[in-house]
Amino acid sequence: MISNLLKMLSYPFMQRALVVGILVSLCAALLGVSLVLKRYSMIGDGLSHVGFGSLAIATALGFAPLAFTIPVVVLAAFLLLRMNESSKIKGDAAIGLISSSALAIGVITVSWSSGMNTDVNNYMFGSIIAMSDEDVVLSVVLSIVVLILFVLYYNRIFAVTFDETFAKATGVRAEFYNMLLAFLTAITTVLGMRMMGALLISSLLIFPALTSMRLCHTFQSVVICSAVLSVVCFLLGMSLSFFLSSPAGATVVIVNLLAFLIFSAIARIREHTA
């Protein structure tokens, strides 16, 4: 077993995948707690569809995929936030409207273009082992920026997560921190698409947070548990993917699902025995 793990770690593409995957998993887990508590967890799914559409356009036009997609997805995140706050189109309806439109644009772009199916499929279904050195550097830098900003503004994010009205009354600029949360989520979603794919990235935001809430009862403990659980599930999923020759993103999701089911069962047993 040890020799197989060492063999896995000896491949440069696996080393890159693990470094990027751990950082993105951490970012997604930390942000996911706030998104789930604010009942906005599906924003990752909506933004990933926007990301797919913009990636298809970037590939067709010969632009750098991540450099083109990140600003587009950030703008979409701000638009979703603005629609949710001031428009008659709220929450899940706004996400569905924007995500389905962006996905349709992406599909049409792919159908009109030739020679780009492989690149687009990598972002649709995930292919972390196919990341270029430039993708790795950009992903690492942006992931570190996301983590630093989350830690720096942790108390403010906590305040707007639990009681936005009270936070405003105490002088917290709730709109700014909601925009910061949307910005960080957009960055994490784009980075996670390379690893998980547009169809599965929302699982990185949702599963660790939901699982941790079955075990912990304070915001801080849920955040810490979610971060640890997300990294552990990613490492287990990547290892199983390597040994079973299964898709990396899908395997990570299955491991997260199993963790959720196991810890939900444990929490239910604890409730009945308490």
List PLM regions with ranges.
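Transmembrane alpha-helical segments in multi-pass inner-membrane proteins
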Residues: 195, 199-250
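Helix-loop-helix "hairpin" substructures at the membrane interface of multi-pass membrane proteins
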Residues: 136-208
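Short loop segments and helix-boundary regions at transmembrane helix junctions
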Residues: 33-116, 212-224, 241-243, 267-269
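Small-residue-rich segments of transmembrane alpha-helices in multi-pass membrane proteins
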Residues: 50-60, 98-109, 130, 174-185, ...
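Transmembrane helix-bundle core of multi-pass membrane transporters
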Residues: 2-16, 87, 95-155
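Loop-to-transmembrane alpha-helix initiation sites
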Residues: 17-20, 65-73, 92, 96, ...
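Membrane-interface capping segments at transmembrane-helix boundaries
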Residues: 155-156, 265-274
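C-terminal binding/interaction regions
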Residues: 4-10, 124, 128, 229-266
